[in-house]
């Protein structure tokens, strides 16, 4: 299931105990007969949610749909030099953590990969993934990671829906099948907000009614404060079909936009341009953040609020109301998800984004909420730009919320130019562990950790680390006392 907003590079799948899956040449065999079936005992769970076993020859086998402790009949569908890939054909002895999937499409739809595992066990697994990846870098957590979680269903407020028309003219609308570009036709999706899930069947009927359904590339859905926005990716403009889309949006009570054209698409509102926004709370304040359909917005509103609450709680000692004006540098700041709440606590916030349009949106959100945030643009993948930012802002607190590629350029700069406190919010624990290793090598100490279950029923996890540089913090305290 692909989200609406910031494009983040795809994660590579990872194994356990240091074994990481690598892309192999086409020396791959797809097995279908009984010679590809094996009885296996599952020893663990890989980071991507697959069971891990070893066959009679000691070769590692990754098994989709299998859980630790289970004995299964597995069908090998791909052989590689260092490991095989398989899927469960029969569960002989089931784990106590195995549950019935809440979605009837589970197993064919590729949007979720952990629905057969209880929600509690999913979250324990995600905590263990973070602990193990950090341990591989020699980093020990000070205690169990906090869990930031909410409902397991009906939580997702944005989604990209694929559209395909086959050679017989049949419309398929849904998400990609597992390991395939084929679409699984969906009438509902239990992880979507009900307001979005209920649109899947009407949307298919709408595409079927178009004169040129093959001109529809995909559909994007976004739920924001009491309204739903539909964005149509229209590969070729079609005036009659645009009229049909407007009528559909009016009947369903939707905001409607479209990306028009194939090579250099332009965005256009097909209904009156709305003032889209979402809300955050920061202490006693309610903040209203404006956004556009293409902006990055966390898919799970409730878990995002828990992450913001956690950031404010962890940083409270550094944001003492006795001494307001703590200098905070927020990098990859987006529309102000962390910048604005921190500013309400009296911090002097400088927020940085790579996109000029996003900087303007962030500045507008600060003005709308009457909080003092300085927004600026910089290339955060450029080491020299990162060095200049650290030098010119001299932050006491650094907040990082990078894409999946992480923030290695910046973390390398922090080795030479340490900041007393670093709050790192990550959507990929592997790049978080890599970057945290740079910081720990420079004297930083991990003080707090949390796992955010942003995408329940999937192996994806978000995490937070709070790191302190004790020497830098002491120097900062001394400077404040002298002042």
UniProtKB/Swiss-Prot annotation:
It holds the Pfam family TRAM. Its EC number is 2.1.1.190. Residues 1-36 are annotated as: Disordered. It catalyses: uridine(1939) in 23S rRNA + S-adenosyl-L-methionine = 5-methyluridine(1939) in 23S rRNA + S-adenosyl-L-homocysteine + H(+). The keyword DNA damage does not apply. [4Fe-4S] cluster binds at residues 103, 109, 112, 189. Residues 29-90 form the TRAM domain. PANTHER family: 23S RRNA (URACIL(1939)-C(5))-METHYLTRANSFERASE RLMD (PTHR11061:SF49), RNA M5U METHYLTRANSFERASE (PTHR11061). Catalyzes the formation of 5-methyl-uridine at position 1939 (m5U1939) in 23S rRNA. This is 23S rRNA (uracil(1939)-C(5))-methyltransferase RlmD. It comes from Halomonas elongata (strain ATCC 33173 / DSM 2581 / NBRC 15536 / NCIMB 2198 / 1H9). The lineage of its organism: Bacteria, Pseudomonadati, Pseudomonadota, Gammaproteobacteria, Oceanospirillales. The gene is rlmD.
